[in-house]
Amino acid sequence: ILKGVKLCKGMLSLWNNRKIEEMHPLELFKYCPKCGSPRFVENNEKSKRCEDCDFVYYFNASSATVAFILNERGELLVCRRAKDPAKGTLDLSGGFADCGETGEEGVAREVMEETGLEVVETQYQFSLPNTYLYSGFLVHTLDLFFLCKVKDDSQLKAMDDVADSFWMPLSEINPDEFGLDSVREGVKRFLKKHN
């Protein structure tokens, strides 16, 4: 199934003996999530259909958030990743949006979980697509970038999946040190606008 077909903009073509990063996520879905039937087949390049119950499953990008937080000195809050993917590289605070959450609520929750800082204001900046290898599964994301203001930046502490968090002058930031593709590109855009 789905062999040699190029799926979803920007994805690699599919061939036998591929790495997980090269597989379309729908290839990993073998059973209908509604009735459990193994007759869960390709419907088109974006979906699978159950031949028993007619359920159609469309694979869509997961929503994720990223925070640009500046302190009073104009320094950017930067984190160091504690876990893979890209463990040890620089990152910005953020993460997956929960069901029922707005992007603004999601970025505020993630900032609190990762840094202990309370977001009091958010302003949407832009979005970028990304892929994120998690537990052997390639997750396609749509990352929503926000400029955030926090209540008290003196309460900063690294928590959750952040090994370290610190303030960096914009002039010292090297986008190539950021491990995730979308965050690297987002930092480049942010620096171009704010330098």
Place the predicted regions along the sequence by residue.
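Short cysteine-rich clusters marking metal-coordination/redox-active sites
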Residues: 32-35, 50-53
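Conserved N-terminal beta-strand and adjoining loop/helix that marks the start
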Residues: 52-76, 96
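Conserved Nudix-box catalytic region and its N-terminal flanking loop in Nudix hydrolases
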Residues: 71-113
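Active-site-adjacent beta-strand/loop module that shapes the phosphate/pyrophosphate-binding cleft
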Residues: 126-154
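NUDIX/MutT-family hydrolases
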Residues: 157-187
